[in-house]
Amino acid sequence: MKYGRFLLLLLVACIILLISGIALKIFLVQQPFLAEDVPDWKVQELTPYKWELRSVDDPERSTTAWITRPEKMQCDTLIIVGGVEEGEKLLSGGGKWKYTGNTILMKQPVHSFLLRHYWKNWDLLDWWQIPEKIREETRHTLGALDALLNYVKGAKPEDTRFTDKVVMAGGSVGAPFPVILTSFAPEKVDGLMVVYGFTNFQRVIQPLLFNQGLIHYKLTENSTDFSMEVKITGLRLLTDFFSFLLANMLKYGEMETYLPNISGTPIHFINGTKDPLVPPEAYLPLWDNSPDPKSDTWVEGGHFNPGNPEDMLRTGKLMYEWADAQKLRSCKTVVQ
């Protein structure tokens, strides 16, 4: 009897210790980024339209930036960080991309890194370190974007491609990166755009996990079958828990933490009126915590679809018009 009680107490102590360890880990990893956290990266032009960005301290980490620009013109520059799936084809946009001037799209470095460190090969220690791994990927994305910004902003006088005006934009899950970086050095960024961006990660993540669970287990949400209702309730509780956990892991990416530190840089938000990923409670904290000058545009429809040429046309036009209204647009012919 005493032995059984001892085992029970030992089990309870182990559970409490595990929960405390997880809570401490999440608390440490969720702290906001500071300017000194941004690692050094460098830029190499492979061709006039394709650049390589690589970490200085960890050369295994690299990514690509694509540039589209008018020939023989010196123009302002728009630097874009897209969502997790967006790459070179985003700028082609089925021939619909209409932002004139220099447009640079940076692919998030997480793509190439994960290809070499595929999660199916992870051991238990790797999974335990996943909060730190995600934060490290975010940190290096900031480093790559910082290198790109400094490369364009610090162009030599003989480089006649760029004016001194740079606008940064982040789309969807790529939105936090320009915001975080701008908060560290707002004087470097002449305009900031948040395109279909969001905060309140738990509110965004939970429906995604829940819907994927319904599909995976072939469940129907409105079913009246008792056994199916039990499964759906269990699935909802699990997705509530994991979305809460993930949201707290990613708290350092909440843009409302950094937006108040931006001064003198105009900020513009582009949102969908019926975006299932970005309900009002996932956007309003961004607006409320943004300093003036700020503005927003509401586009009829759902979340931005980079594969839809009409979305590309509409979004590019809105970005162009806003930058022009802020007097950030300029292009002039370069005499060779």
Q: What function would you assign to each model-found segment?
A:
Residues 70-100, 105-108, 113-116:
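Short, surface-exposed "cap/lid" segments of acyl-processing enzymes
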Residues 299-312:
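Histidine-bearing beta->alpha loop at or near hydrolase active sites
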